């Protein structure tokens, strides 16, 4: 079943792009000036947001993923993005609990030796759960909410929304979530933002490397994970933007509805098609092979679905 998406256009993002897209080329093309990182604290749990400079006509996609049969068509193309901040790591179990007062993860004990349980990525979260988390995190830090979910003509009050009120089955109201990218709160990355961050200023196939034999240094995937998640920011190297686990550990939800191919070259701050059945997931996981861990590999799942191999990270405006 297809669901119509109510989208609030990015207000003023074109102006942000014009002001922020100063030429400073890197291997992936189009990168702008450096953007400062930011560390936040919620209920004593710290997390870091890494600055990603605005980009003009940056290179995304990959020739290995030019056909739909290769995991959702994502041929080489260009995209322009306003500056943003993205989580240094996937959302951890401890941060999720601090915001949502809930621990949904299946990997909730027996961490790998030398790893801390609460710093493993949260999993078994739906796209709906991510929307609620983002708004609740924004409220806790005094920021504007990026998402509006309207039920019976009235917007949900996320400050009082109970965890068990988040739908566990397909829900038209949540599928029609309105997104305002001009707000300064937390949200899911768009597919384009996610891929640009994963590439880390390079044209590498995976986050951190272009060499298959070196992937083990950057990613937890089926060849080295031991069939479980691992503490974020532990034992693996970051990519060129100092982001951890953009390849592997858990798949990551994005904002966009899944479509058969990525947008054509030349778009600015694309947010995907207006409706669909599946929401985008990226990055591969502890369960997946190296092909699915590639920066350009695309997949999708129903927004109410959960999995032990799926989590998320957040973004926000500077």
Cite the ranges covered by each PLM segment.
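Short, well-ordered junction/capping motifs at the entry into regular secondary structure
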Residues: 169-181, 216-247, 273, 299-304
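Bacterial Sec-dependent N-terminal signal peptides
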Residues: 2-3, 17-43
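Active-site microenvironments of metalloenzymes and redox enzymes
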Residues: 62-67, 80-209, 258-260, 318
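Surface-exposed recognition segments
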Residues: 73-77, 202-203, 225-228, 246-318
């Amino acid at each position: 079943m297809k669901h119509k998406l109510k989208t609030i256009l990015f207000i003023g993002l074109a102006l942000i792009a014009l002001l922020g897209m100063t030429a400073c080329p890197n291997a992936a093309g189009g990168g702008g000036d450096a953007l400062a990182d930011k560390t936040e604290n919620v209920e004593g749990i710290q997390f870091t947001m890494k600055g990603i400079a605005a980009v003009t006509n940056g290179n995304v996609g990959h020739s290995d993923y030019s056909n739909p049969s290769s995991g959702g068509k994502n041929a080489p193309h260009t995209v322009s993005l306003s500056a943003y901040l993205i989580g240094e790591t996937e959302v951890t179990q401890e941060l999720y609990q601090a915001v949502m007062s809930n621990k949904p993860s299946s990997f909730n004990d027996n961490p790998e030796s030398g790893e801390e349980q609460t710093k493993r990525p949260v999993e078994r979260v739906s796209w709906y759960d991510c929307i609620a988390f983002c708004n609740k995190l924004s409220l806790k830090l005094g920021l504007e909410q990026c998402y509006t979910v309207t039920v019976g003509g009235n917007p949900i009050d996320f400050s009082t929304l109970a965890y068990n009120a988040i739908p566990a089955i397909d829900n038209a109201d949540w599928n029609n979530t309105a997104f305002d990218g001009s707000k300064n709160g937390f949200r899911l990355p768009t597919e384009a933002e996610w891929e640009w961050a994963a590439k880390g200023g390079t044209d590498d196939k995976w986050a951190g490397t272009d060499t298959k034999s070196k992937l083990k240094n950057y990613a937890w995937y089926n060849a080295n994970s031991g069939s479980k998640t691992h503490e974020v920011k532990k034992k693996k190297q970051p990519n060129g933007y100092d982001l951890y686990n953009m390849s592997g550990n858990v798949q990551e939800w994005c904002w966009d509805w899944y479509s058969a191919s990525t947008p054509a070259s030349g778009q600015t701050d694309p947010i995907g098609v207006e409706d669909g059945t599946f929401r985008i997931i990226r990055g591969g996981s502890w369960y997946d092979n190296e092909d699915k861990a590639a920066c350009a590999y695309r997949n999708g799942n129903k927004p109410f679905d959960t999995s032990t191999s799926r989590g998320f990270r957040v973004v926000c405006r500077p």
